[in-house]
Amino acid sequence: MAFDISVNASKTINALVYFSTQQNKLVIRNEVNDTHYTVEFDRDKVVDTFISYNRHNDSIEIRGVLPEETNIGCTVNTPVSMTYLYNKYSFKLILAEYIRHRNTVSGNIYSALMTLDDLVIKQYGDIDLLFNEKLKVDSDSGLFDFVNFVKDIICCDSRIVVALSSLVSKHWELTNKKYRCMALAEHIADSIPISELSRPRYNLCKYLRGHTESIEDEFDYFEDDDSSTCSVVTDRETDV
C-alpha cells in the first residue's frame, strides 16, 4: 500500500511512534495540517518512507509503502501528544511561528514555550509596565526600540528574547499593531545564533519528556552540531 503526502514547508509535521502492548501492533500517529492520521501494523513489518523537499512548490513530500494488512484511521482536530522531529533550522521556524501568532498557536511545543513567561517576569517584573513605560512599544518607533532592547540579550539567552518577543507580539495584536508581529518574528528568528538554540531545544526536550515542569530551568546541555535531528517522546500517551 503506497502513500504520498505533500505539506507546505512552513507547516510542522508531528508524529508519535510507539508499540501498543494492548493491540500488539506498532502505531504511528501523524498530524498534518490539523488532520490526524493513525496507522497500525504488526511490529515485524517494515515501513519504507522517503522524505524530500520540493523547492518548486516549497513543500515537504513524504512517500512510502505500508504493509498490506494496515489499519489507517483519520480524524480532524483531535488533540494528541506527539513526537516532534526538527533540526535547528526548522526550530527557528517554530520560534518564529510562536512569536508571530502567540494568541492562536496551540500544541505541546507552544505550551512549553509559554512557561518561559515566568522567567521573564522574574527578571523584569511587571511586563505591561516594561512595555508601556520603559520601552513604549506602542509608539511610532516601538518596534525599533524593542529590537534595540533585546539585541544584547539574544546572544546570551535566547529564551528571554523569545519570551519577550512573543509577549510583545501578543500585546500588539490586542492593540491593532498586528503588522509588526511578522516583521519582529522574522528578525528575531534570523538573529538568534544557531549555537544559542541548543539550550532552549534541550530544555524543551526535557520538559516534553516530563522531566521538568517548565523550560526555564538551567540544564547541562551539549552542542549537537553533528546531529541535525532532535526527537522528543511524550510518554504520557504511550504504553511503551
Swiss-Prot record:
Q: Among its keywords, does the record have Ribonucleoprotein?
A: no
Kindly state which keywords UniProt assigns to this record, in alphabetical order. Early protein, Host-virus interaction, Inhibition of host innate immune response by virus, Inhibition of host IRF3 by virus, Inhibition of host NF-kappa-B by virus, Inhibition of host RLR pathway by virus, Viral immunoevasion
- Residue ranges spanning the membrane: these are none
What Pfam families does the record tag this protein with? Poxv_Bcl-2-like
Triggers of expression = Expressed in the early phase of the viral replicative cycle.
Q: Which Gene3D superfamilies match?
A: dsDNA poxvirus
Q: What quaternary structure, including any partners, is listed in this protein's UniProt entry?
A: Tetramer. Interacts with host MYD88, TRF4, TICAM2 and MAL.
Q: Which family does it belong to?
A: Belongs to the orthopoxvirus OPG176 family.
Q: What does this protein do?
A: BCL2-like protein which disrupts the host immune response by inhibiting the TLR4 signaling pathway leading to NF-kappa-B activation. Acts close to the plasma membrane and targets several host TIR-domain containing adapter proteins including MYD88, TIRAP, TRIF and TICAM2. In turn, blocks the host NF-kappa-B and TRIF-mediated IRF3 activation.
In Swiss-Prot or TrEMBL terms, this protein is called Protein OPG176
The species this protein was found in: Variola virus (isolate Human/India/Ind3/1967) (VARV)
Gene name, Swiss-Prot/TrEMBL:
OPG176
